[in-house]
């Protein structure tokens, strides 16, 4: 009994330390996942805690479940617009990119470590997948907004490249364990995994949405049902030789983008579950490693990390994105943010579980490379994004959102609150002074703890909390009118887009009438929208910039079909 109590105490203390450590991580800018990993190592058998954990079966089980929850949460937060912009390039990175990374890294590893070329390719396959947990958490914890073309490509790639990496790893493990052959059947296996995973993910997502609409459950049970369903979907898909990770990611996508009142509740709970999964997974992997064994292959692992980061990944990105005409800056950033996290370490358990010779070599080398990736790539995401000018201002939003879950409405209804700061456009004005969607209802103001009713037409003052009842779909439009600029932003909208906003349907000669610019030949009657769209090969996102003589045109807003709607204009720096 004492041993059980001690185990519970240790688990609780490790969780508490990990949660508190996130504050330190945000202060020094360190990747949170790296902090969790280090805490696990410090608690391990050669660390301060002295905890011995060397069970790869348990590690694989816990890691797989944690990844399922993380991928489901990431899928729920993927907007349909991101698929429009990035599905095809992300799919190329998740297939051709993985193969190129595996080949280049594997051959380099074989030469550096003196391994057989098949063993080198196995190590390359283990390292070929970018990690969804790392990518999702880095973007969330950094609080930066990257151009959708780049962020969407990275997120969709990290959520969908596991099938190819898993397939290559399992195939090469089988070859080295002498129970399978390396031939063209590998391609058939991959296609089978992708097709089954995609079909099951689509069906499971639609079925879950149907059940949410039909089952009269308390809202508290829907997040639990989502966990049960995504774990079951992973297991069933894997049992039928499909990609369970891809199925779970797609299921999350269809659930997260369904118009259900339960979705907001599920998202809120799963945000905590995803963080819990990341803490558990990285603590466990930190406990599993033996730090002294990492030193045995430290220098070769660092050399392989250099090949992976500076040669294999950029080459994979360059070859994969040739058909899509990505700007050079976008490709450079995508190359740099090929983050490795828990997935390579978990894939490195496959040789260990299968009894492949030198099984600890794969695990230890993968572990070192993951640490290198998190330290150098994860730590530098923000400055690299700013250096390449890929960061865009965050979208305005309410300070608090309160969904009215229990109301049986066809559309999700929310009460949103905007706290007035010094730069708020609402100061010293009244509600009727603003143009907002007609469905929005002003509920009043909370001032010094007192509720001032809407019928009294209060004049808005500093630190007031303005309450608005509206449809969830109208929140972005309302926020554009009412929200203050966040004090934590690294840039303001006017700094990035310019002080003037133009309708994208005006023509270049109409623009010339105001600014007296030199126009390109034969394009004077072209609209701003067409001029910008043509230069980005019809894949435009908010933040795309085009220089026109002495002006910089920046895409500020797209319509529902992805067409340029509003353009910011400012003078060029040069």
UniProtKB/Swiss-Prot annotation:
Gene3D superfamilies the record matches: 1.20.1530.20, 3.30.465.10, Regulator of K+ conductance, C-terminal domain
Subcellular location field: Cell inner membrane
pH-dependence of activity, as noted: Optimum pH is 7.5. Exhibits K(+)/H(+) antiporter activity between pH 7.5 and 9.5.
Top-rank taxon, per record: Bacteria
Membrane topology: Multi-pass membrane protein
Domain RCK C-terminal: 402-484
Protein's GO biological process: potassium ion transport; proton transmembrane transport
Regions crossing the membrane: 4-24, 28-48, 56-76, 85-105, 117-139, 170-190, 191-211, 216-236, 244-264, 272-292, 302-322, 332-352, 361-381
Keywords, sorted A to Z: Antiport, Cell inner membrane, Cell membrane, Ion transport, Membrane, Potassium, Potassium transport, Transmembrane, Transmembrane helix, Transport
GO MF, any single term: monoatomic cation transmembrane transporter activity
GO cellular-component term (any): plasma membrane
InterPro entries, alphabetized: Cation/H_exchanger_TM, FAD-bd_PCMH-like_sf, FAD-bd_PCMH_sub2, Na+/solute_symporter_sf, RCK_C, RCK_C_sf, Transptr-assoc_dom
Family: Belongs to the monovalent cation:proton antiporter 1 (CPA1) transporter (TC 2.A.36) family.
NCBIfam families noted in UniProt: PRK05326.1-1, PRK05326.1-2, PRK05326.1-3
Function noted in UniProt: K(+)/H(+) antiporter that extrudes potassium in exchange for external protons. Can also catalyze NH(4)(+)/H(+) antiport. Could have weak activity with Na(+).
Name of the molecule in the record: K(+)/H(+) antiporter NhaP
Organism from which the protein derives: Alkalimonas amylolytica
Gene transcribed to yield this protein: nhaP
């Amino acid at each position: 009994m004492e041993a059980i109590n001690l185990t519970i105490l240790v688990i609780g203390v490790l969780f508490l330390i990990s949660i508190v450590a996130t504050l330190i991580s945000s202060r020094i800018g360190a990747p949170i996942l790296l902090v969790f990993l280090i805490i696990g190592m410090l608690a391990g058998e050669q660390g301060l805690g002295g905890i011995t954990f060397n069970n790869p079966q348990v590690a694989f089980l816990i890691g797989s479940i944690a990844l399922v929850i993380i991928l489901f949460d990431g899928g729920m937060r993927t907007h349909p617009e991101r698929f429009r912009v990035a599905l095809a390039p992300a799919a190329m990175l998740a297939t051709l990119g993985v193969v190129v990374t595996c080949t280049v890294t594997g051959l380099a590893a074989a030469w550096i470590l003196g391994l057989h070329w098949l063993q080198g390719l196995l190590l390359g396959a283990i390292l070929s997948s970018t990690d969804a947990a790392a990518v999702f958490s880095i973007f969330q914890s950094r609080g930066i907004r990257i151009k959708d073309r780049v962020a969407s490509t990275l997120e969709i790639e990290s959520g969908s490249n596991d099938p190819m990496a898993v397939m290559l790893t399992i195939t090469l493990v089988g070859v080295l364990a002498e129970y399978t052959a390396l031939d063209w059947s590998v391609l058939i296996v991959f296609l089978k995994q992708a097709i089954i995973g995609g079909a099951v993910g689509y069906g499971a997502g639609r079925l879950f949405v149907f059940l949410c609409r039909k089952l009269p459950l308390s809202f508290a049970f829907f997040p639990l049902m989502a966990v049960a369903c995504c774990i079951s979907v992973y297991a069933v898909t894997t049992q039928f030789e499909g990609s369970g990770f891809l199925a779970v990611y797609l299921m999350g996508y269809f659930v997260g983008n369904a118009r259900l009142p339960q979705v907001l509740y599920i998202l809120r709970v799963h945000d905590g579950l995803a963080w819990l999964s990341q803490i558990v997974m990285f603590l466990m992997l930190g406990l599993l490693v033996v730090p002294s064994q990492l030193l045995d292959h430290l220098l070769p692992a660092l050399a392989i990390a250099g090949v992976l980061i500076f040669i294999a990944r950029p080459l994979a990105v360059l070859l994969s994105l040739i058909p899509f005409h990505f700007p050079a800056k976008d490709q450079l950033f995508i190359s740099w943010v090929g983050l490795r996290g828990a997935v390579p370490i978990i894939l490195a358990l496959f040789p260990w579980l299968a009894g492949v010779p030198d099984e600890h070599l794969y695990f230890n080398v993968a572990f070192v490379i993951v640490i290198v990736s998190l330290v150098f790539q994860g730590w530098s995401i923000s400055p690299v994004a700013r250096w390449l000018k890929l960061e865009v201002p965050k979208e305005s939003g309410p300070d608090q959102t309160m969904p009215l879950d229990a109301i049986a409405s066809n559309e999700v209804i929310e009460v949103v609150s905007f706290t007035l700061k010094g730069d708020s456009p609402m100061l010293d004005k009244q509600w009727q002074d603003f143009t907002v969607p007609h469905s929005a209802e002003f509920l009043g103001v909370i001032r010094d703890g007192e509720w001032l009713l809407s019928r009294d037409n209060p004049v808005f003052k500093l630190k007031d909390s303005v309450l608005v009842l509206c449809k969830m779909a109208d929140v972005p439009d309302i926020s554009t009118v009412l929200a203050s600029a966040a004090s934590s932003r690294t840039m303001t909208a006017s700094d990035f887009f310019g002080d003037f906003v133009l309708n994208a349907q005006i023509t270049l000669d109409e623009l010339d009438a105001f600014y007296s610019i030199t126009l390109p030949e034969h394009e004077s009657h072209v609209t701003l929208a067409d001029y910008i769209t043509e230069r980005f090969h019809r894949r435009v996102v908010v933040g795309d910039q085009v220089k026109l003589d002495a002006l910089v045109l920046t895409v500020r807003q797209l319509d529902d079909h992805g067409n340029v709607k509003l353009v910011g204009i400012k003078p060029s720096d040069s």
